[in-house]
């Protein structure tokens, strides 16, 4: 059970890492053609063909992903997302926390007073 709990705790960190990697990939300039060419001897080997094909497929996926997420990384869209998140989740956090704290304090004082012996705390009616 603890293994499952650890996996669930690691999920937000993993999502953050993927988001950072996507941002880095989107911000990097396009690679110039012909910068990394294999030596002539390795050009026709099977592994170089597999590596070349995988590179083509991955570049296609990365470029499509970058193009698809480009709208999100524009300043106005990201600012709008953060403003909406703040409005939905964080705006009322201060007053809600203060109200919860005061309510919890009052409840705790009532419970403590009800458990307190009359000789130590005195009678409620005398107060």
UniProtKB/Swiss-Prot annotation:
It comes from the Eukaryota. GO terms for cellular component: extracellular region; high-density lipoprotein particle; very-low-density lipoprotein particle. Glycans are attached at residue 63. One of its GO terms (molecular function) is lipid transporter activity. It holds the Pfam family APOC4. Residues 1-27 form the signal peptide. It is found in: Secreted. Keywords: Glycoprotein, Lipid transport, Secreted, Signal, Transport. Expressed by the liver and secreted in plasma. One of its GO terms (biological process) is positive regulation of triglyceride storage. May participate in lipoprotein metabolism. Belongs to the apolipoprotein C4 family. This is Apolipoprotein C-IV. The lineage of its organism: Eukaryota, Metazoa, Chordata, Craniata, Vertebrata.
């Amino acid at each position: 059970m603890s293994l499952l709990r650890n996996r669930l705790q690691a999920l937000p960190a993993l999502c953050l890492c993927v988001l950072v990697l996507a941002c880095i990939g989107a911000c990097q300039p396009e690679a110039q053609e012909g910068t990394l060419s294999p030596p002539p001897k390795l050009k026709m080997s099977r592994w170089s063909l597999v590596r070349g094909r995988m590179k083509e497929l991955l570049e296609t996926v990365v470029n499509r992903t970058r193009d698809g997420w480009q709208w999100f990384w524009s300043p106005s869209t990201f600012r709008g997302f953060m403003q909406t998140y703040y409005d939905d989740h964080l705006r009322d956090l201060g007053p809600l926390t203060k109200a919860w704290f005061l309510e919890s304090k009052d409840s705790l004082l009532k419970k403590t007073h009800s458990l307190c012996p009359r000789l130590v705390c005195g009678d409620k009616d005398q107060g």
